[in-house]
A protein has these predicted regions:
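Transmembrane helix-loop-helix hairpins at the membrane interface
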Residues: 5-111
Length: 111
């Protein structure tokens, strides 16, 4: 049971932040001209994140919304990090947000 808890609360957000925010932002910005379309990148990231959580239609919708929160946070903190307004890399900030979200969900589901 503890392995599942650690996996769901710590490891999954680590991998998902790397894949669905950091990698997707990086790969889409390689497309010429795409760097101007941050809103599109945020939505693409959110949709892919949501679709990867395909337990049910409602869960996909909820995961898309959370994916939007994570992607928007990643974009926001990337800009702040690049401008020197924060010393924390956006990856770790989004990972912390995701971990806190998963902790709250875990306690709600298991109370």
């Amino acid at each position: 049971m503890w392995i599942q808890i650690v996996d769901g609360i710590v490891i999954a957000p680590l991998l998902e932040t790397a894949l669905y925010q950091m990698f997707i932002f990086w790969i889409l910005k390689l497309i010429p001209g795409m760097e101007k379309y941050n809103k599109s990148i945020i939505f693409i990231s959110a949709i892919i994140f949501g679709l990867s959580h395909n337990f049910s239609y409602i869960y996909i919708l909820y995961a898309c919304i959370m994916g939007f929160v994570f992607a928007y946070s990643y974009w926001t903190y990337t800009r702040k990090y690049e401008n020197g307004h924060t010393k924390f890399p956006p990856f770790w900030i989004v990972w912390c947000i995701h971990v806190l979200h998963n902790i709250v969900v875990f306690f709600i589901k298991n109370l």
